[in-house]
Every structure is written in structure tokens, then in C-alpha cells.
UniProtKB/Swiss-Prot annotation:
The gene is pnp. This is Polyribonucleotide nucleotidyltransferase. Its EC number is 2.7.7.8. GO terms for molecular function: 3'-5'-RNA exonuclease activity; magnesium ion binding; polyribonucleotide nucleotidyltransferase activity; RNA binding. It is an enzyme of class 2 (transferase). Its main location: cytoplasm. Keywords: Cytoplasm, Magnesium, Metal-binding, Nucleotidyltransferase, RNA-binding, Transferase. It comes from Histophilus somni (strain 2336) (Haemophilus somnus). The keyword Cytoplasm applies. Residues 552-611 form the KH domain. GO terms for cellular component: cytosol. PROSITE patterns: KH_TYPE_1, S1. Mg(2+) binds at D485, D491. It is found in: Cytoplasm. Its cofactor is Mg(2+).
């Protein structure tokens, strides 16, 4: 075996591409490494197309092996299971920029598998996987119009940083991944700490310029190690069939696309489609339904795109920069902690915020170890939202991706745990959908968080932009419909505050998207975002002053770290009895910070009082109220504060001589005692002598009524 290796410098890292030694039965296989992070990527492409295949079956799988980090998986089976949310998101990250680079009409099945086999904790494997997938496709010989490059851009001390390490990323105000060809950007995924539109665009341009090194290296690698290009040509257009479909459907489709209501429009389009299929197949039974539908869809695209480029009204009658009608309601669910319904045209999100304690935080078992997430965001897209029936179950890739985008949009304005000691979960239920439900989720989440009294730094709104481009003629669309997304050339989503951008996601289906077009889209998105924020601020101008009556109240107190074991008790018995008896939740940090959560304020005060008693120190000369726990011939043991116990010697029970302890004291009896001495071993000597004559008076002078409380002398 003589592997072929290509090595090049990429920013501060060294990238190595190797092929020819492993997985030689795959169509192509590449071991891509960036320093010590290695991802093994394979491509298998079928030479034959399944009969009746009318779509491109591309599958991208990304999987992390725990051995890559020198770990053994947890759980009973001790092996990796179904893909995690993080793995699903990275699979989407690989898929999005490569899918548009396969030619129209190419329906051969392709599977890409990226396996993380070694990981340096400072270098994320996602970028390495993208580079490896691009290289493997370039070697495979399939009709792939790549290669693509990929770059991560950080923003530290007002400077762009190429492929920052994990430690550098913690100081960065930006996490942006950009992928594209040598000519154009194809995909952007980012999260930002409220940067300007100009800074975001500059980051995209910077990343695209830097990744040219990767593209050139992969071209050289493919020239040396690549397989012969497949002899594939796109099937010739059936002009007779195209004209036939056009003659039946064009005018009727034109009228249908003037129906502004989505369901009514779809019903009319379905009728036209069924009529076309019936008429065409009646004349020639050999023509497949799939081919007719492809031509029908292309005709729909021509009609919609042509109208937009000619400056005619859009499908729903709007101009290119008009945002659909907005409707906002907050506090819609009485027993939840915060809720809002955000409606934009025919897209609607019900967002609900829930506050929890630190024990509600999500523990994520990542490749390099466990991570705790205190802000959870879940996006649900039920079939009824588009008027369909379907399966209900675990979230699909799309739901996971949309939820993460919405979370990125809101994360920058969330308070820190020290500012607001709650774990926060937001759920966005999409109840209607006709374009940009993820951005509706951002708006709904912002409203629900404010309704819940979460002190977010500013309101956040999101907007989806579209593009229709033919040669040098282009139109940027604000607040796109589902059809405009499907038939357009770009899906460009921007979330942010009045001050700047918090998240940017871009997927482009064509080449030739210039920085000028992106700048126009960003400016138009800013204008739309300001309009939406204005309406949101009218509904709820600031976070509620107080949290919901149904949300847990979290109170904090400090104890001596040495006393933590006393509060917890043997095997957790003490803290468990506190929580069970009061209905509270108690979390104790190593520094002695105690967080007590409960809906009932009185329960919290009771717990705080009991913890103060448990952790209190017994002092010499102080008088306490205690309870007799044991009797002995030589005296009585009395429970004091802080789980401490002292001895009242028989000679210290009364002024007169005591012959028998049980004549004066009984187990469970409350008594007033004074601390005489605490010896080196911590043993406490008590006396009742001076206090025995006037126990009643001392009881009236109690500072606190609880067992073990000190009293005034």
C-alpha cells in the first residue's frame, strides 16, 4: 500500500489529506487531519439509478467514536448509540454546501460517512469533516462541481481569527463557519455577540478568501489521486412534453399563483397538476408521473420567478421588502411561567418559557467530556402546521437544526447564571407554517422570555430573506413564503437586536452571489428586523418585573464550606429530609453557596432557618434551648444547634444534690442550658444550674423558637 498524502498549512494549523491505505473498496476514502484531530471520510456512489428515481438520494452521516478521545462510552451497552444532537447538526453542516454542487438530473445514490477517529480537544472535528468530505467527493469521480473549502472565523479583540482553537473561541464574539467554492459562498452558519451587519459580512468575505488555500490543495490532491470523471451527461430535455405541460397548465398556474391564501392556492395547484397528469398519460402511458411533476414544478418556478424579476407583486401581493402582517399575544397560557403567540402572515409560533433549578440543566456527554447547558431550546414542527397528517415522534434533523438556529439567535441576550440563577427552557410549537418558522421561533422566544420575567439584555427578532437571480438581474425578498424559499436561489436568515446581529444562516443554491448582493440582503433584513422589533416592543416593552407565581423562587445563602457535610448528612439523609418535609429543592456548591428553590416562600424561609441551625457554631457562655436526647447515670445529653450534642453532668442539673437524673429530666424534654466548656476533642459541657430556677423566664426570652436556638441571658 502506497498512500498518497497532501499536506498544507491552514492558518495556525497543519492539514493532512491521505488516501489509498484504508477502505479501498469505497468509491473514495480520505483521512483528513488538522493537527491531532482526524476524521475518516468515505464516499460510496452507485453507478446505476433505481428505476423510477426522481430525486437525488444523498445521505450524509457524521459519527463520533469515543475512542478518538481515549474514552469508553457510558451506559449499559458501553458502545455508541443513535446520533446525538451535535452529530446531527454537523451532518447537516457537511450536507448543506455540497448538495447544490451536484448537477440537476443526477439521481445516483451517494452516501458520505464521516467518522471521527482522533480528537485534539482544542480543534473541533466539524471543519475537518467538511474538508474531508470535499476531498473524498473530488477523488470519487462523481459529477461534483467542487471542491469546496470551509473555514471557521472568530472575532477576538476586534480582529478576525481563522480557525480559532477551543480556548480562543471562548474569548471570541463570533463563531462563524463559511463554506464555498473558489468562486462563491454557498453556506454560512454563525452565532454572534451582537455584531454589526458590516462586521458579519466582512467575516464571511474573510473566511471565503482564506479557504481558497483548502480548495487549491484539494484540486492538487485530486489531480494526483483522483479517479476518472464519470461519463455522465444530463438527460436531454423532452421539449415535446415540456410544451405539452406548458400548454395545459401555464395560464391556469398563473391564475393560481395570484391566490394569496396558501391552502386555497395549494388546492388549485393540486387540481391543475392532477389534470395535467391525466391528460398527458392518456396520450402516452409510457411517460412517468415523476417526469411530468418535474416539468410542472419547473413551470411553477418560471412563473413565480419571472413575475418577481419583472417587478410584479409577489405570490401574496406584497412588494419585495414588505413584511407580512404581525400579530402578538403574551401571557396566553395561565399556568406556564411565560408564553407568547407570534404570528407573521400564515406562519405562527407558540413559544413557552419554563424556569428551573440547576438540577434541571442538561448534561451533554460530548467527545471531550461532559458539558452542562443551562439554556435549552426545543423546536417542534407538527404535521398539522402545514395542514397535513403525519407521524409524531422524536425530532427529525430539520427540527434539531431549526431549534439550534433559533437558540443561537437568542443566546447572546440571555443573562448569566450569576445574574439569573435559573435554568431556562424555551419550547417553540409551530402551529402554522408558510415560510421562516425558525425566525418566528426567535421572535416568540424573545416574547416568552420577557413574559417569564427573564432579564434578557434586549428583544430579539428574526427574518428570512430570499433571492431570485437570473444572470445580472436579481431581486432580494424580505420575509419569504415557503414557495419563495423552495423556488428561489437563497435562504438567508438573520436574527438580532436593535444593536446588531446575533445569528446568521445562509444557504445558497447557485454560484455568483457577490458581497454586494449579501450586503443588500443584510441591509434589507435590518430594516425588516427593526419593523418587527417595533411591533414586539409595543406588545411587551421590557421583561416583567417579577417571575410567575407558578415558577420556583430561588434564594441563596452562604455557609462555611466545612459545614457542607453537616447539611448533607450521612448518605444525604439531612438534605433529603429537608427537601421532603418542605417541598423545596436544594443545591449546594463547593464554595458553600446554598440555592433553595420553591414556589412557596414560607417553605424557603423554613429551610433557611433550619440550615442556619445546622451550621451554627456552639459558643462558650451562650445560653441555648435544647432537647434531651439520652439519659445516663452520670447526666443527660442535650441536642443543640448544628447537630451538636452536649452533656449536662448530674452535678450541673440543679442547685440541690441530684440522686437520680430521671427524677429531673426526661427524653424529649426541652431545657435551657448554658455552655460551660468545649474541650479539644469538641466535647461540650453544659449546665442548667444557674437557669433551673427560672426556666419559664428564659423560654420567654428566646431569640428563636426552634430547637437549639440561642437565648438571651
Amino acid at each position: 500500500m502506497n498512500p498518497i498524502v497532501k499536506q498544507f498549512k491552514y492558518g495556525q494549523h497543519t492539514v493532512t489529506l491521505e488516501t489509498g491505505a484504508i477502505a479501498r473498496q469505497a468509491t473514495a476514502a480520505v483521512m483528513a487531519s488538522m493537527d491531532d484531530t482526524s476524521v475518516f471520510v468515505t464516499v460510496v456512489a452507485k453507478k446505476d439509478v433505481k428505476e423510477g428515481q426522481d430525486f437525488f438520494p444523498l445521505t450524509v452521516n457524521y459519527q463520533e467514536r469515543t475512542y478518538a478521545a481515549g474514552r469508553i462510552p457510558g451506559g449499559f451497552f458501553k458502545r455508541e448509540g443513535r446520533p446525538s444532537e451535535g452529530e446531527t447538526l454537523i451532518a447537516r453542516l457537511i450536507d448543506r454546501p455540497i448538495r447544490p454542487l451536484f448537477p440537476e438530473g443526477f439521481f445516483n445514490e451517494i452516501q458520505i460517512i464521516a467518522t471521527v477517529v482522533s480528537v485534539n480537544p482544542q480543534i473541533s472535528p466539524d471543519l475537518v469533516a467538511m474538508i474531508g468530505a470535499s476531498a473524498a467527493l473530488s477523488l470519487s469521480g462523481v459529477p461534483f462541481n467542487g471542491p469546496i473549502g470551509a473555514a471557521r472565523v472568530g472575532f477576538i479583540n476586534d480582529q478576525f481569527v481563522l480557525n480559532p482553537t477551543m480556548n480562543e473561541q471562548k474569548q471570541s464574539r463570533l463563531d462563524l463557519v463559511v463554506a464555498g467554492t473558489d468562486k462563491a459562498v454557498l453556506m454560512v452558519e454563525s452565532e454572534a455577540d451582537i455584531l454589526t451587519e458590516e462586521q458579519m459580512l466582512a467575516a464571511v468575505v474573510f473566511g471565503h478568501q482564506q479557504q481558497q488555500i483548502v480548495i487549491e490543495a484539494i484540486k492538487e490532491f485530486a489531480a494526483e489521486a483522483g479517479k476518472p470523471r464519470w461519463d455522465w451527461t444530463a438527460p436531454e430535455a423532452n421539449t415535446i412534453l415540456i410544451e405539452k405541460v406548458k400548454s395545459i397548465a401555464e395560464n391556469r398556474l398563473g391564475d393560481a399563483y395570484r391566490i394569496t391564501e396558501k391552502q386555497a392556492r395549494y388546492e388549485q395547484i393540486d387540481l391543475i397538476k392532477a389534470d395535467v397528469i391525466t391528460q398527458v398519460t392518456a396520450e402516452d402511458e409510457t411517460i412517468s408521473e415523476g417526469k411530468i411533476i418535474d416539468i410542472f414544478t419547473a413551470l411553477e418556478s418560471q412563473i413565480v420567478r419571472g413575475r418577481i424579476l419583472r417587478g410584479e407583486p409577489r405570490i401574496d401581493g406584497r412588494t419585495v421588502d414588505t413584511v407580512r402582517a404581525l400579530d402578538i399575544c403574551t401571557g396566553v397560557l395561565p399556568r406556564t411561567h411565560g408564553s407568547a403567540i407570534f404570528t407573521r402572515g400564515e406562519t405562527q409560533a407558540l413559544a413557552v418559557a419554563t424556569l428551573g433549578t440547576e438540577r434541571d440543566a442538561q448534561i451533554i456527554d460530548e467527545l471531550t467530556g461532559e458539558k452542562t447547558d443551562h439554556f435549552l431550546f426545543h423546536y417542534n414542527f407538527p404535521p398539522y402546521s402545514v395542514g397535513e397528517t403525519g407521524m409524531i415522534g422524536s425530532p427529525k434533523r430539520r427540527e434539531i437544526g431549526h431549534g439550534r438556529l433559533a437558540k443561537r439567535g437568542v443566546a447572546a441576550v440571555m443573562p448569566s447564571l450569576s445574574e439569573f440563577p435559573y435554568v431556562v427552557r424555551v419550547v417553540s410549537e409551530i402551529t402554522e407554517s408558510n415560510g421562516s418558522s425558525s425566525m418566528a421561533s426567535v421572535c416568540g422566544a424573545s416574547l416568552a422570555l420577557m413574559d417569564a420575567g427573564v432579564p434578557i439584555k434586549a428583544a430579539v427578532a428574526g427574518i428570512a430573506m430570499g433571492l431570485v437571480k437570473e444572470e445580472d438581474n436579481f431581486v432580494v425578498l424580505s420575509d419569504i413564503l415557503g414557495d419563495e424559499d423552495h423556488l428561489g436561489d437563497m435562504d438567508f436568515k438573520v436574527a438580532g437586536t436593535r444593536e446588531g446581529v446575533t445569528a446568521l444562516q445562509m444557504d445558497i443554491k447557485i454560484e455568483g452571489i457577490t458581497a454586494e448582493i449579501m450586503q443588500i440582503a443584510l441591509n434589507q433584513a435590518k430594516s425588516a428586523r427593526m419593523h418587527i422589533l417595533g411591533v414586539m416592543e409595543q406588545a411587551i416593552p421590557a421583561p416583567r418585573a417579577d417571575i410567575s407565581d407558578f415558577a420556583p423562587r430561588i434564594y441563596t445563602m452562604k455557609i462555611d464550606p466545612k459545614k457542607i457535610k453537616d447539611v448533607i448528612g450521612k448518605g444525604g439523609a439531612t438534605v433529603r429530609s429537608l427537601t421532603e418535609e418542605t417541598g423545596t429543592s436544594i443545591d449546594i456548591d463547593d464554595d458553600g453557596t446554598v440555592k433553595i428553590a420553591a414556589v412557596d416562600k414560607n417553605a424557603v424561609q423554613e429551610v433557611m432557618s433550619r440550615i442556619e441551625d445546622i451550621t451554627a457554631e456552639v459558643e462558650v457562655g451562650v445560653v441555648y434551648k435544647g432537647k434531651v436526647t439520652r439519659l445516663a447515670d452520670f447526666g443527660a445529653f442535650v441536642a443543640l444547634v448544628g447537630n451538636k450534642e452536649g452533656l449536662v453532668h448530674i452535678s450541673q442539673i440543679a442547685e440541690e444534690r441530684v440522686e437520680k437524673v430521671s427524677d429531673y429530666l426526661a427524653i424529649g424534654q426541652e431545657v435551657i442550658v448554658k455552655v460551660l466548656e468545649i474541650d479539644r476533642q469538641g466535647r461540650i459541657r453544659l449546665t442548667m444550674k444557674e437557669l433551673a430556677k427560672d426556666q419559664t423566664k428564659n423560654e420567654e426570652n428566646l431569640l428563636q423558637s426552634e430547637e437549639g436556638s440561642p437565648v438571651q441571658e
